Regions:
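HTH-adjacent hinge/linker in prokaryotic transcriptional regulators
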Residues: 2-25, 30, 36-99, 110-116, ...
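A structural signal for short coil/turn segments at secondary-structure junctions
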Residues: 116-117, 202
């Protein structure tokens, strides 16, 4: 049985409303079309405000990642985050000083750094500082300032002033969107300003973002995408966005 794209879109919206999420692989089988075609459907529906894409599928607006608590965020796309973390670890050397923000992907990165020595971590994330503190050879600096109680990160002028006293060999950021046109973006403006300063205080900037973030533009802009030295992501069908980022000088590595 064949479906018009309009009919398929209607049914996908109904499935999202019923189950809260859909998977690309399951929709591909259901409609007997390629996963590439399903991803294009999801892109259209996301642009219309019906859903948000995540790795391997999409979730309804009532289950947006931005609305999840910290525990839910940590579990979401766990396999993709672990793969990104293992890739990120290859970019880190003993004796590095690393600035990192509050993304849950970076908690996985810290776990992947368990074999490194004499690493200094500067972060505004309580969760990531706690992870880093598990390794005796790591030096951990948790930035002070105002505390976001839901997502456990610090922000504000006190955090920025403290950050500006430090210099890092590398900055690893988790972002909610990256595109050639809109740059690096996050859902919260108080996070974005601090992330911008982390880039300014570091020699090399590494962005770890799964493919659902490619081409995405959310509320708060950090900086131009060209400020990214390395983008670490999982394999994506969004070759158009990948090519645009490469033209800006971003070196892209896929898991």
């Amino acid at each position: 049985m064949s479906f018009s794209s309009e009919k398929r879109h209607e049914e996908i919206i109904e499935l999202i409303q019923l189950n809260g999420k859909v998977k690309v692989s399951e929709l591909s089988q259901k409609y007997n079309i390629s996963e590439v075609s399903i991803r294009k459907d999801l892109e259209v529906l996301e642009a219309q405000g019906h859903l948000t894409r995540i790795h391997g599928g999409a979730v309804g607006m009532n289950k947006l990642y931005v609305n999840m608590d910290l525990t839910e965020r940590f579990k979401t796309n766990a396999a993709a985050k672990r793969a990104l973390a293992e890739l990120a670890a290859k970019f880190i050397d003993d004796n590095d000083t690393i600035m990192m923000n509050a993304g849950t992907t970076l908690a996985y990165v810290l776990r992947a750094l368990r074999g490194k020595k004499n690493i200094s971590i500067v972060t505004n994330s309580v969760q990531n500082a706690t992870e880093a503190a598990l390794f005796p050879s790591f030096n951990v600096i948790l930035l002070g300032g105002e505390l976001d109680s839901k997502y456990q990160f610090t922000y504000g002028q006190d955090a920025i002033r403290q950050l500006e006293n430090y210099h890092a060999t590398k900055c690893i950021l988790s972002v909610d969107g990256i595109s050639a046109e809109s740059g690096l973006t996050l859902y919260y403006s108080n996070e974005a300003e601090l992330a911008r300063r982390m880039i300014e205080c570091s020699d090399v900037t590494i962005v770890a973002a799964d493919s659902s973030k490619l081409g995405k533009n959310v509320f708060a802009r950090i900086t131009d995408a060209s400020k990214t030295d390395f983008l670490l992501t999982n394999r994506s069908d969004n070759s158009y966005e990948i090519e645009k980022l490469r033209k800006l000088g971003v070196k892209i590595h896929e898991t």
